[in-house]
Structures are given as structure tokens and as C-alpha cells.
């Protein structure tokens, strides 16, 4: 079990089953999780929990505000580690993300 007090991982994905899969895995390891179903909600949750989020797992393609836009806005004020989830495995997309400040990629689907 991980002993993390008042720190959260933020899981952002428009697919509820994907959020649940990631959340269940991390909770079983002892992490506290916050969730958002779109980019706008992700920014709200991030701002409401300023300084308490230790990691963001962020989907690229979402309604309202995509992962790239969320990443850009967060990088204006924070260097919190961000892992992007993407169904697109093209190298050009990964390079674009790294230029914007993403820390790592996970391709969907994953097992």
C-alpha cells in the first residue's frame, strides 16, 4: 500500500469504462483518485485541487476540450507529470505531445 496523504492522481477520459479500469487499478495499489469526463471538467478539478495532484492520466481525444488543450493550459502553471492516453499511435502525435510537455504515452487499448 502506498501512504500518500492529501495527494491525488487525476484520471481524465470521456469513456467511463476506461476511467473505471484505471481507477480500480490505482486504488488497489493505494492511490487516491479524482476523475473527470472531459477537458473542461479536468481543468476545474485541477484548479480546485491545486498542489494536491501528483499525476495526471489524460486522454487525447475528448469532447468539449481535447487533451492537447488541457495539457497546454496546465503547462502554463504546473509541471505535474502527465501521461497521455491515445488510440492514435502515430509518431508525429507523440512528438507533438512531447513538444507540449507530456511526460509519457500509453496507447489504447492496453492490457
Tell me the role of every PLM-derived stretch.
Residues 59, 86:
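Active-site residues of response regulator receiver
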Residues 38-41, 66-69, 93:
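Acidic catalytic/metal-coordinating carboxylates
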Residues 44-47, 68-79:
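Short amphipathic alpha-helix used as the core "switch/output" element in two-component signaling
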Residues 62:
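Receiver (REC) domain active-site loop signature in two-component systems and cognate sites
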Residues 20-28:
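Charged docking surfaces used in two-component/phosphorelay signaling
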Residues 35-55:
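Acidic, metal-coordinating helix/loop segments flanking the phosphotransfer/catalytic sites
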Residues 1-10:
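Non-catalytic signal-transmission and effector/linker regions of two-component phosphorelay proteins
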Amino acid at each position: 500500500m502506498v501512504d500518500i496523504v492529501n495527494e491525488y492522481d487525476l484520471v481524465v477520459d470521456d469513456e467511463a469504462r476506461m476511467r473505471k479500469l484505471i481507477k480500480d487499478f490505482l486504488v488497489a495499489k493505494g492511490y487516491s483518485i479524482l476523475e473527470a469526463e472531459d477537458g473542461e471538467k479536468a481543468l476545474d478539478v485541477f484548479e480546485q485541487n491545486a498542489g494536491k495532484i501528483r499525476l495526471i492520466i489524460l486522454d487525447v481525444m475528448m469532447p468539449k476540450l481535447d487533451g492537447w488543450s488541457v495539457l497546454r493550459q496546465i503547462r502554463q502553471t504546473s509541471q505535474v507529470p502527465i501521461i497521455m492516453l491515445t488510440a492514435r499511435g502515430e509518431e508525429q502525435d507523440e512528438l507533438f505531445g512531447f513538444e507540449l510537455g507530456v511526460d509519457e504515452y500509453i496507447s489504447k487499448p492496453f492490457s
